């Protein structure tokens, strides 16, 4: 008898309750049999990642299969689609929407709502009904490795109003918003993918700086909120908020009055995995007040079974109150019912191609119903963002900040410095390549490796100039002799090697044009030609390409 059969045979009621609060991942572009079987028994749904998406147009068929396999109301089909640097649907080429930092820079809440309505419309067309967005984190640490351009900014009021606008936009399109990362991840210097983070300061600071955006999201009707694996010593002690009853049941539900679904951040993240292991973290999270458990991108069928078995065993052993598990399952069931009603009321999906995109919003899945008018985004080869006016590109254009002299490019050499990977964003398509002359773009690492392109080896090593290998400022300068030189960076302030490389290039070539596609905390000398896009989305790159004369405006 398999572990799967063991658990269900031993206590089928508890097994179904446990399945009813899980949204596991799966490998590949089609759900395997175990996922389809579990959906038939009452599994809450799934979480999609880039590994599940070969191309946007491919997504509708597997999401339809997930719905067809599901017993009762349709499944929760969740994804991280924030716009900007965090995209799963458009990871190959980059998002056609600017991210939160760019939208916060523009500070037009109507535009933020329109962009998120467009994101929601794209997701709804693909059969995705739950977006783990927006980020409501107030940026307090310039070196925030987890948040950065995912935040609307460093001002609590600005973040609050744009969080509310983003929630409204997504839910205008019939997609549930899951606001994150409660109680606020923007003032930490640790990425919870790698270790537990701590918010320094007391509850007074938390209430003043970090909580107002979540209060704004609640007022806007956010369907769900995601706590983070970080601790606030005065509130949670040594525990992360994600397993703290004081944070979830006391603060979020009791003080802030949130009555929607509380969704765990990925349980595979080291902040909780290293402390408890995934199964025990799941039990502690539900006991503290979590309703829906996200296992994470790498979660396997074995992880799913282990979590389900741990929940069942915890109820049997008295470590988890059975009524708490029932409460969580009931709340998720109501979420699924609301999503199913929203989908049935929506216009039929028209599919996505290089020439068209899907339907506009059909009404909010939140507290009220909001009629959604036509929206659209900047075009990309994926077919995303081709409904109505190019709101994504419009927003990206408005966000770009320009300083220094305008220069006309002549046979440019474009150096793109690959940053250290942000785990939440992963590897995604970025840069000026789609608009640059053939052979002009060279991707290098800050550590001095040519990642693609040719002809940029060290000046004294002709052999390495034939392809990927070592690269230094001298080699770049030699290759750019008599040509325009453009350097493109992301979050240069975080990496001394990136700053050193750019500084060496500027010392020899003060006519260099520097394009910052992250946060512009590190600035070149006054008089440098400089563009800051506040994110590395395809839309932001397109806007920069226009200003550089690489793309028609």
Which role fits each region the language model picked out?
Residues 1-41, 275-553:
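Preference for extracellular/luminal or secreted protein segments
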Residues 12-16, 25, 52-71, 75, ...:
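Second-shell residues forming the walls of enzyme active-site clefts
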Residues 27-30, 79-87, 91, 129-139, ...:
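Short glycine-enriched loops at secondary-structure junctions
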Residues 93-107, 151-153:
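A charged helix-plus-loop insertion that forms the helical arch/lid used to bind
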Residues 106-124, 138-144, 148-149, 163, ...:
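A substrate-binding/cap region within the structured catalytic cores of diverse enzymes
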């Amino acid at each position: 008898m398999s572990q799967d059969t063991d658990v269900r045979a031993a206590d089928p009621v508890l097994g179904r309750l446990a399945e009813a609060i899980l949204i596991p991942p799966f490998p590949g572009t089609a759900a395997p049999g175990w996922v389809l079987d579990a959906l038939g028994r009452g599994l809450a749904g799934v979480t999609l990642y880039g590994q599940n998406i070969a191309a946007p147009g491919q997504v509708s068929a597997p999401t339809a299969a997930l719905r067809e396999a599901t017993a009762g109301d349709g499944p929760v089909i969740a994804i991280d689609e924030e716009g900007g640097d965090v995209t799963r649907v458009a990871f190959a080429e980059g998002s056609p929407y600017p991210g939160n930092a760019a939208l916060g820079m523009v500070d037009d809440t109507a535009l933020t709502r329109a962009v998120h309505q467009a994101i929601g419309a794209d997701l709804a067309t693909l059969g995705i009904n739950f977006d783990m967005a927006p980020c409501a984190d107030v940026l307090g640490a310039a070196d925030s490795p987890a948040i950065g351009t995912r935040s609307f900014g460093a001002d609590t009021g600005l973040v609050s109003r744009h969080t509310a606008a983003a929630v409204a936009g997504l839910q205008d399109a019939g997609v549930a918003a899951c606001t994150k990362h409660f109680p606020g991840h923007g003032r930490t210097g640790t990425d919870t993918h790698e270790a537990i983070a701590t918010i320094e300061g007391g509850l007074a600071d938390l209430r003043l700086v970090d909580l107002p955006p979540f209060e704004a999201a609640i007022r806007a009707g956010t369907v769900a909120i995601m706590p983070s694996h970080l601790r606030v010593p005065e509130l949670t002690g040594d525990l992360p908020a994600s397993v703290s009853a004081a944070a979830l049941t006391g603060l979020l539900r009791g003080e802030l009055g949130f009555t929607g679904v509380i969704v765990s951040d990925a349980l595979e993240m080291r902040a909780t995995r290293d402390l408890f292991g995934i199964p025990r973290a799941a039990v502690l999270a539900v006991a503290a007040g979590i309703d829906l458990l996200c296992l994470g991108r790498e979660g396997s069928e074995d992880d799913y079974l282990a979590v389900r078995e741990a929940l069942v065993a915890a109820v049997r052993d008295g470590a988890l109150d059975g009524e708490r598990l029932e409460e969580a399952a009931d709340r998720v069931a109501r979420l699924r019912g609301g999503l199913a009603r929203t989908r049935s009321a929506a216009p039929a999906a028209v599919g996505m191609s290089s020439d068209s995109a899907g339907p506009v919003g059909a009404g909010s899945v939140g507290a009220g119903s909001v009629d959604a008018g036509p929206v659209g985004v900047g075009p990309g080869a994926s077919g995303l963002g081709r409904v109505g006016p190019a709101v994504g590109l419009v927003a990206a254009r408005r966000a770009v900040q320009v300083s220094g002299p305008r220069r006309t490019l002549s046979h440019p050499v474009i150096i793109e410095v690959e940053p250290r990977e942000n785990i939440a964003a992963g590897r995604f398509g970025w840069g000026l390549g789609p608009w640059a002359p053939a052979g002009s773009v060279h991707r290098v690492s800050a550590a001095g490796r040519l990642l693609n392109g040719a002809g940029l080896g060290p000046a004294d090593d002709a052999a390495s100039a034939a392809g990927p290998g070592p690269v230094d400022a001298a080699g770049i300068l030699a290759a750019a002799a008599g040509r325009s030189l453009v350097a493109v960076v992301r979050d240069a302030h975080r990496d001394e090697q990136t700053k050193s490389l750019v500084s060496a290039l500027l010392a020899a070539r003060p006519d260099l044009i520097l394009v910052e596609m992250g946060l512009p905390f590190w600035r070149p000398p006054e008089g440098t030609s400089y563009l800051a896009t506040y994110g590395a989305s395809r839309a932001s790159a397109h806007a920069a390409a226009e200003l550089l004369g690489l793309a028609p405006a």
